Amino acid sequence: MLIYSDIITGDEIISDSYDLKEVDGIAYEVDCAMIEEGAVQVDIGANASAEEADEALDDGVVKVNNVVHSFRLQSTQFDKKGYLVYLKGYMKSVKNALKEQGKSDEEIKDFETKASAFAKNVILAKFKDWEFYTGESMNPDGMVVLLNYREDGTTPYVVVWKHGLKETKV
């Protein structure tokens, strides 16, 4: 299995156990699902019929997004201006990380061009529809994972920056 971690913070962001679809050579989209968390049934062997009226307890069932829950992503908020400031700094950090990895100037220029187009045409075009998540460490310099819903309005998906991930085999 491959775990993809943020190259800046080291936070685990996604794994190949989810179906990663590359988009425009710059990002990965991953379809998610809402799952129920909690509600553990414990049978202690008591005779339920001999007990008094069944106590109605809140069993703590919570619907959570499987990717957000599995990788302990933390919700955060941005306005458009704040996100642009963050994105500029983040892209500079990724560019520096790519240089450290020995990527060519051509590859880095390609990254910058594609990232700019993706941010403008995909993220900013529908900015109000996105939800934002940081990695577990909540480091403000790290990747912000984007969550949105497909056209059906019920299927969530996340978007992560391809070049901001480090692959680790486990």
From Swiss-Prot:
InterPro entries: Mss4-like_sf, Mss4/transl-control_tumour, TCTP, Translation_control_tumour_CS, Translational_control_tumour_p
Protein name: Translationally-controlled tumor protein homolog
Similarity comment: Belongs to the TCTP family.
GO biological process, one term: translation
GO molecular function: calcium ion binding
Record localization: Cytoplasm, Cytoskeleton
Name of a matching Pfam family: TCTP
Function: Involved in protein synthesis. Involved in microtubule stabilization.
GO cellular component annotations of the record: cytoplasm; microtubule
Keyword annotations: Cytoplasm, Cytoskeleton, Microtubule, Protein biosynthesis
The keyword Cytoplasm belongs to this UniProt entry's keyword annotation: yes
Protein's organism: Neurospora crassa (strain ATCC 24698 / 74-OR23-1A / CBS 708.71 / DSM 1257 / FGSC 987)
Main localization (coarse): cytoplasm
PROSITE patterns to which the protein is assigned, alphabetical: TCTP_1, TCTP_2, TCTP_3
KW Nucleotide-binding (keyword) present: no
Domain TCTP: 1-170
